[in-house]
Amino acid sequence: MEGLVVKNYAGFYYVDTGKAIYMCKARGKFKKDNIKILTGDRVIIRELVPNSEGVIESLLPRKNELIRPPIANVDQVLLVFAFADPFPSTELIDRLLVMAYALRLEVVLVFNKFDLVNPESQKLFEYYKKILPKVVAITARGDTGIDELTDYLNQKISVLAGPSGVGKSTLINRLVPGAKLATGEVSPKIKRGRHTTRHVELIKLPFGGFIADTPGFSNLTLPEMDKLELQSYFPEFNQNRKYCYFPNCLHVKEPNCRVRELLETGEIPPFRYENYLTFLEEITSDERSS
């Protein structure tokens, strides 16, 4: 019987077969062969107690695997930020975008708390909407943008990530009535929320698909990559690199650089270029130290 591991907790694996959720142990061969079963894995189980307990017999091939958070077979990442309270960090948005694209994952960028939108955050939202295929404004405590978001989530395994206090748990409670996840209110003193998620669990969406509220991405170190690779994760840089004089242009000091021309005319905002330079320096430092 095939199923999906939706939770790995206290030595038990909870496997959703579509008809029931089985509490399972894994056969000894997995430990012997040092094979770790992750949330998101598709497995074959043998039923021990009808619709209740089973044993994991085999692990099906993975499409992908994330280390932090430890989860397999992810289709896309939902990056959740807020229009305000807390105001979005563009450095964190861009860092998470690069990390997701480097892992070959699709991205849905969500701006929550639309009721708190201000001119500055609206401008940010509009720019990202121009350069990315899936950007949506929502109010997790209301209806704004929820239909559009459910279309993106339908029949996919999605990982939820973003800073604390932006409404990730509130969003899951909105999408899955009865989930009753703890919510982290924003501290008025530091304008950040309390972390409320302890382990990785896939929550079944009523309209199809699964969503994980994760404790990560706790490690925000960029994955290993070549300097030239970085710009491929900045769509507006990647689209214009062919117009640069040098084919291997890094858009730093090279003459006749199309990206820097667009920066000067305001078509590329300074924050995007500054974040690109920050990441490029990180990659360069890593190359020097290796």
Swiss-Prot record:
It is found in: Cytoplasm. One of its GO terms (biological process) is ribosomal small subunit biogenesis. Binds 1 zinc ion per subunit. It is an enzyme of class 3 (hydrolase). Zn(2+) binds at C244, C249, H251, C257. Keywords: Cytoplasm, GTP-binding, Hydrolase, Metal-binding, Nucleotide-binding, Ribosome biogenesis, RNA-binding, rRNA-binding, Zinc. GO terms for cellular component: cytoplasm. GO terms for molecular function: GTP binding; GTPase activity; metal ion binding; rRNA binding. Its EC number is 3.6.1.-. It comes from the Bacteria. Gene3D superfamilies: Nucleic acid-binding proteins, P-loop containing nucleotide triphosphate hydrolases, Probable gtpase engc, domain 3. Residues 63-220 form the CP-type G domain. Belongs to the TRAFAC class YlqF/YawG GTPase family. RsgA subfamily. One of several proteins that assist in the late maturation steps of the functional core of the 30S ribosomal subunit. Helps release RbfA from mature subunits. May play a role in the assembly of ribosomal proteins into the subunit. Circularly permuted GTPase that catalyzes slow GTP hydrolysis, GTPase activity is stimulated by the 30S ribosomal subunit. NCBIfam families: ribosome small subunit-dependent GTPase A. This is Small ribosomal subunit biogenesis GTPase RsgA. The lineage of its organism: Bacteria, Bacillati, Bacillota, Clostridia, Thermoanaerobacterales.
